[in-house]
C-alpha cells in the first residue's frame, strides 16, 4: 500500500475498504459514500484519518442550503447547509436518512410516507389541533387532488396516492407494495437526492455561482440582526421585562409566552418581583415526563422559561421600534412629496395604509407645486381610455416612490384597475424617456389578459412575452441577448422566473429598471424557493400588486415589505419574526393571538408609508351591491356516520386541545410525524365534507379484480402486471375509477350507475340554487379548490342538463382567455366551473352575477379573490355569493379561522366595525 485508504463503492450502496479488507453494509446512501470517498482523498493529503475525513465532509455539508433535487456531486458542492433529512432515491423510494449532526448518526429510518404511519389507530385525529394552528398561519401543503397551477410543493407521492377506503369501508388494509406511480418514480430517478431543509435552519441566502453580485444586498444574515441587537440598552430591556412581568394579566402572559393559563396564574401569584432574578427562580411543581430508555427528564423551570421568552420578545420590540422610526423617516419624504402636489395624505400610522382618492382633496392646498404631478393620463397612454381620479393619483404615487428610490405595494381592492394603473405608470416613464427594460411577473392564468391590456392601454410599449417551451425560450434569449433594446417590458410567469436555472440567470442579467409582481401575495413566504429566486433578480424599483396584502398573518405582510425594501428590513428580520410569529397557548383562542394589539399597531406603523389602498366603497358609487350568504348544509344519516366514524365520534375542539397539550411534550422527530399525520387527516375530513365519491365506496375489491383483468386488453396495459394494476386501483377514489372506466372501452361496463354523484349534501343544495338561477336568468361562477370535485361537478351539470365551461390549473394558457370570451359571448352557458387557485386571480367574469364557493379555504382572501371575479368594474347586476359549509364538521372551524384573518385585515385598515356587521348579517 502507498499509505492511502482505498474505498470502493458498489451499486447497492455497500463499500469495500481495501485497507482493512472489509465489505461494509450501506449505512450511507451511495451519494454520501461518494462524498466520503472524496473527503478521504483530501484527508490523505492532509495526513489525517477518519476524523479528518469527517471534518472535511462536515465542512462540505455546511455549504448545502437550498431545498432542491441534488443531481450530482458537483451540484452538491455548489450548495450550502446540508439538510437534517433527505431521501436517497437510489436505495429505496421509501427510505429516508436522518442526519442528526454527525455521520455516525446517518442511518435508515422507516418512511414517513408508509400507510402504517398515516393514521393513529388510537386517535385518528393525530395532531389536528397543532396543524390547524399551523395552517392558520400559512396555507397547508397542496394535496394531489387540489388545484394550483403555481404550486411547487405537494404532499409526498405515497401520501397523495392513499385513500381512506380502508377506514371508510372497514376493509383490511392491503400489504404495502410499490404502486405503479411509485415504481415509475423509482425507475425515473433523474432528480437524484431530494433535500428538505427546515425553514428555521435557513440562515443565509447565498447566491448561486452564476448569481449577480447584487444578490448580496438581499441577504438575510444573522450578523445584520446582531448589528441591531448591539444597539439595544440591556439595562433598559431588563427594566421593561420586569415591568411587564409585574403588570401583565394572566391572559396576556399566556398569549405572549404560549404557556398554559395554569402556568401563567402560578407565575402571577408569585408577584411582585423586585428584580428579574426573583422571577427566574420561580419553579412550578410538574409531573415527571417519561423518556423511555433514556430515563426521566423535566422541562425547563417555569421562571427561566417565561422570562426568557419575554426577554426575546421585548428585545424584538426594541428592534422593531427602531425599524418603525426608519419607516417614519422614509414616510416623511413621501408625505412631503404628496403635499407638494397640493394633496392631503389621509394616511396615518393608525390606519396602516395610504388612501388617496380624488382631486377634491386639493382644494385646501391649491394647485400642485410639484411639476412632476400629472392630472391627465400620460401622453403615450391610449387617448380612448378615461382614467378615474384615484387611478391618476395612483400613477403619481408610483412615480413619487420611483423618484425617491423606494418601493411600494399597490393594494387597491380587486377590480379597481391595478393593471391599468401599472401600464399607465410605464407610459409615464416612456414619456420621460425611461424606456426600460421593465419586468412584469404574473400568474400564468393572467398572461393573455396582460397582453390584451398592454395592447389596449398603451400600444406604443414594446412587449416581450417570455414564455413557451424550453426551445422557444432559448430562441427568445438568443434574440434578446443580441438586441437588448428590442423591448420595453418583459412579461413572464412566477414559475419560469423561479424554477429553471437558465431562465433565472437570463432574467438577472437583464438589469431591469422596474419590476412589477402581479398577485404579490405569492411572495408571502420568505423561506420559499420562489421568494429567494425572485429576490435575486436585481431591479431599481419594485412594485407589488395585490388586492389582499394580508393573507394569513402579520409575518407574511412583513415578508412583502422585506421583499420590496430589503435595505430597510434586512437588519431586523429575525426580530420581526419573533414579534409577528404567534405564540398560542392551549387555552387561548386563535382570534386573540392573531389580533394582538401590540403586533397590529406596530405593523400598521411600518406599512403605512409604502401601501396605497383604495376600497370600492370609496371610489365606485355605482358598483352594484354584493351580498354574502353562508349556506349551512346538513349531512344525510349515511354521510354523518362516515364522518363520525372517521372522527372517532368526538368533538373537534376537545380533540384538538388535547393534542396540542400532547404536542408540547413531543420531541422534534415525533412532532414532525404528528404534523404529517395531521395534514393528512385534515385533507380527509375536508374530502368527507365535500363528497363521498372522493373515497372508494362503490368499487369493492371484487369489482376491481374484474377491472384489472379486463383492462389488460388495452394496448397500453398489455405488458402490465395484473396484480400491480389491482393494487394501484385500490388507492383510487370512486371518481377516479369512474373516469378510468369512461376512458377505456374494455371497462366501460363498470361505470357507476344511478348517478351517485347527485347523492351528497352539498350537491343537493347546489341543485336547488342552480335551478332557481336558471329560472331567474342568473349566470353562475362555481368555484372549488379541488380538481376531483370539479370532475364530480361536471357530472352534476350533465345530469341537470346545464351548459357549462371548465377552467383549472391544467387548462392550457393559450386557451384560457378563449374560454372567458366564450362565456361572455354565449349567454346560454349557465355555469363556469373554476378552481379557486387557477381561476381566482386576475380574471374578469363580470357577466356572471352569482358566485358559489363549493368549499371553504384556509385562506379567506382566496375566497374574496374568487368573489371579485364577478363583483368588479363592468358588473351591471347585484352579485350574490353563496359559501357552502357543512354543519358540525371541520369546515366550521376553518370558517372561524377565516373570520379571524378577515378581522385582522379590517383592524389594519380601520374597518373592524364594518366587518363585524357583515359577519352578523351572514
UniProtKB/Swiss-Prot annotation:
**Where is ATP bound in this sequence?**
412-419
User: EC?
Assistant: 3.6.4.12
Task: Enumerate the catalysed reactions.
Answer: ATP + H2O = ADP + phosphate + H(+)
Query: Which SUPFAM superfamilies does the record associate with it?
Result: P-loop containing nucleoside triphosphate hydrolases
Domain Helicase ATP-binding, which positions?
399-567
Keyword Isomerase recorded: no
Whether Nucleotide-binding counts among this entry's keywords is yes
Compositionally biased intervals (Acidic residues): 207-223
Task: Extract the PROSITE patterns matched here.
Answer: HELICASE_ATP_BIND_1, HELICASE_CTER
Look up the domain of life of the source: Eukaryota
- Descriptive protein name: ATP-dependent helicase fft3
Amino acid at each position: 500500500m502507498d499509505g492511502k485508504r482505498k474505498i470502493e463503492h458498489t451499486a447497492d450502496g455497500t463499500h469495500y475498504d481495501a485497507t482493512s479488507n472489509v465489505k461494509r453494509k450501506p449505512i450511507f446512501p451511495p451519494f454520501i459514500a461518494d462524498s466520503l470517498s472524496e473527503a478521504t482523498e483530501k484527508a490523505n493529503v492532509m495526513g489525517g484519518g477518519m476524523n479528518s475525513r469527517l471534518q472535511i465532509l462536515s465542512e462540505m455539508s455546511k455549504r448545502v442550503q437550498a431545498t432542491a433535487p441534488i443531481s450530482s456531486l458537483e451540484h452538491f458542492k455548489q450548495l450550502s447547509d446540508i439538510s437534517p433529512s433527505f431521501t436517497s432515491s437510489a436505495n429505496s423510494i421509501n427510505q429516508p436518512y436522518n442526519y442528526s449532526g454527525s455521520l455516525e448518526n446517518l442511518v435508515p429510518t422507516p418512511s414517513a410516507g408508509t400507510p402504517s404511519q398515516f393514521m393513529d389507530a388510537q386517535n385518528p385525529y393525530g395532531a389536528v389541533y397543532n396543524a390547524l394552528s399551523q395552517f392558520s398561519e400559512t396555507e397547508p401543503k397542496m394535496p394531489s387532488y387540489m388545484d394550483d397551477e403555481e404550486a411547487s410543493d405537494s404532499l409526498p407521492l405515497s401520501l397523495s396516492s392513499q385513500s381512506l377506503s380502508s377506514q371508510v369501508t372497514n376493509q383490511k388494509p392491503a400489504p404495502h407494495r410499490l404502486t405503479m406511480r411509485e415504481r415509475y418514480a423509482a425507475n425515473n430517478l433523474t432528480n437524484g437526492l431530494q433535500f428538505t431543509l427546515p425553514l428555521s435552519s435557513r440562515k443565509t441566502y447565498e447566491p448561486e455561482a452564476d448569481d449577480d453580485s447584487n444578490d448580496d444586498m438581499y441577504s438575510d444574515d444573522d450578523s445584520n440582526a446582531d448589528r441591531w441587537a448591539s444597539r439595544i440598552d440591556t439595562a433598559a430591556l431588563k427594566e421593561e421585562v420586569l415591568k411587564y412581568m409585574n403588570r401583565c394579566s394572566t391572559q396576556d402572559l399566556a398569549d405572549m409566552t404560549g404557556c398554559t393559563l395554569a402556568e401563567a396564574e402560578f407565575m402571577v401569584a408569585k408577584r411582585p418581583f423586585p428584580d428579574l432574578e426573583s422571577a427566574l427562580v420561580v419553579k412550578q411543581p410538574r409531573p415527571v415526563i417519561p423518556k423511555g430508555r433514556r430515563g426521566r427528564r423535566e422541562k425547563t423551570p417555569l421562571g427561566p422559561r417565561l422570562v426568557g421568552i419575554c426577554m426575546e420578545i421585548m428585545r424584538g420590540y426594541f428592534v422593531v421600534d427602531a425599524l418603525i422610526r426608519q419607516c417614519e423617516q422614509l414616510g416623511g419624504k413621501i408625505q412631503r412629496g404628496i403635499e407638494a402636489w397640493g394633496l392631503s395624505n389621509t394616511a396615518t400610522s393608525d390606519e396602516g395604509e395610504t388612501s388617496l382618492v380624488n382631486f377634491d382633496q386639493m382644494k385646501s392646498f391649491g394647485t400642485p407645486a410639484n411639476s412632476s404631478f400629472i392630472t391627465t393620463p400620460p401622453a403615450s397612454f391610449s387617448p380612448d381610455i378615461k382614467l378615474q381620479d384615484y387611478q391618476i393619483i395612483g400613477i403619481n404615487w408610483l412615480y413619487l416612490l420611483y423618484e425617491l428610490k423606494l418601493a411600494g405595494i399597490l393594494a387597491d381592492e380587486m377590480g379597481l384597475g391595478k393593471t391599468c394603473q401599472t401600464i399607465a405608470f410605464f407610459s409615464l416613464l416612456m414619456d420621460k424617456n425611461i424606456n426600460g427594460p421593465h419586468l412584469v411577473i404574473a400568474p400564468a392564468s393572467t398572461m393573455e389578459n396582460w397582453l390584451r391590456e398592454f395592447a389596449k392601454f398603451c400600444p406604443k410599449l414594446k412587449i416581450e412575452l417570455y414564455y413557451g417551451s424550453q426551445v422557444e425560450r432559448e430562441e427568445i434569449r438568443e434574440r434578446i441577448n443580441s438586441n437588448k433594446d428590442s423591448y420595453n417590458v418583459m412579461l413572464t410567469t412566477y414559475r419560469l422566473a423561479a424554477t429553471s436555472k437558465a431562465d433565472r440567470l437570463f432574467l438577472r442579467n437583464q438589469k431591469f429598471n422596474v419590476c412589477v409582481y402581479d398577485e404579490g401575495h405569492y411572495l408571502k413566504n420568505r423561506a420559499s424557493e420562489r421568494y429567494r429566486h425572485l429576490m435575486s433578480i436585481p431591479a431599481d424599483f419594485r412594485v407589488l400588486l395585490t388586492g389582499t396584502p394580508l393573507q394569513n398573518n402579520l409575518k407574511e405582510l412583513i415578508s412583502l415589505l422585506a421583499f420590496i425594501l430589503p435595505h430597510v428590513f434586512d437588519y431586523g428580520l429575525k426580530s420581526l419574526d419573533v414579534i409577528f410569529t404567534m405564540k398560542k397557548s392551549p387555552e387561548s383562542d386563535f382570534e386573540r393571538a392573531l389580533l394582538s394589539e401590540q403586533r397590529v399597531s406596530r405593523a400598521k406603523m411600518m406599512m403605512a408609508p409604502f401601501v396605497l389602498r383604495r376600497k370600492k366603497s370609496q371610489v365606485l358609487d355605482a358598483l352594484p351591491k354584493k351580498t354574502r350568504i353562508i349556506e349551512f348544509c346538513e349531512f344525510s344519516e349515511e354521510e354523518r356516520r362516515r364522518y363520525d366514524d372517521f372522527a372517532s365520534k368526538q368533538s373537534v375542539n376537545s380533540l384538538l386541545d388535547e393534542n396540542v397539550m400532547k404536542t408540547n411534550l413531543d420531541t422534534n422527530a415525533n412532532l414532525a410525524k404528528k404534523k404529517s399525520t395531521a395534514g393528512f387527516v385534515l385533507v380527509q375530513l375536508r374530502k368527507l365534507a365535500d363528497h363521498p365519491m372522493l373515497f372508494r365506496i362503490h368499487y369493492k375489491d371484487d369489482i376491481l379484480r374484474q377491472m384489472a383483468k379486463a383492462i389488460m386488453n388495452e394496448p397500453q396495459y398489455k405488458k402490465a402486471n395484473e396484480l400491480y394494476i389491482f393494487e394501484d386501483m385500490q388507492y383510487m377514489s370512486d371518481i377516479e375509477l369512474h373516469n378510468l372506466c369512461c376512458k377505456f372501452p374494455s371497462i366501460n361496463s363498470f361505470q357507476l350507475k344511478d348517478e351517485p354523484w347527485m347523492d351528497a349534501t352539498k350537491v343537493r343544495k347546489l341543485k336547488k340554487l342552480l335551478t332557481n338561477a336558471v329560472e331567474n336568468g342568473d349566470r353562475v361562477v362555481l368555484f372549488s379548490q379541488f380538481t376531483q370535485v370539479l370532475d364530480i361537478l361536471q357530472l352534476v351539470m350533465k345530469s341537470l342538463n346545464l351548459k357549462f365551461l371548465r377552467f383549472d390549473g391544467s387548462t392550457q394558457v393559450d386557451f384560457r382567455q378563449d374560454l372567458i370570451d366564450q362565456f361572455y359571448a354565449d349567454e346560454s352557458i349557465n355555469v363556469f366551473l373554476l378552481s379557486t387557485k387557477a381561476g381566482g386571480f386576475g380574471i374578469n367574469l363580470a357577466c356572471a352575477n352569482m358566485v358559489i364557493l363549493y368549499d371553504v379555504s384556509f385562506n379567506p382572501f382566496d375566497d374574496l379573490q374568487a368573489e371579485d371575479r364577478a363583483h368588479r368594474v363592468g358588473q351591471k347586476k347585484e352579485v350574490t355569493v353563496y359559501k357552502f359549509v357543512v354543519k358540525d364538521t371541520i369546515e366550521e372551524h376553518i370558517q372561524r379561522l377565516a373570520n379571524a384573518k378577515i378581522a385582522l385585515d379590517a383592524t389594519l385598515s380601520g374597518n373592524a366595525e364594518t366587518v363585524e356587521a357583515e359577519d352578523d348579517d351572514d
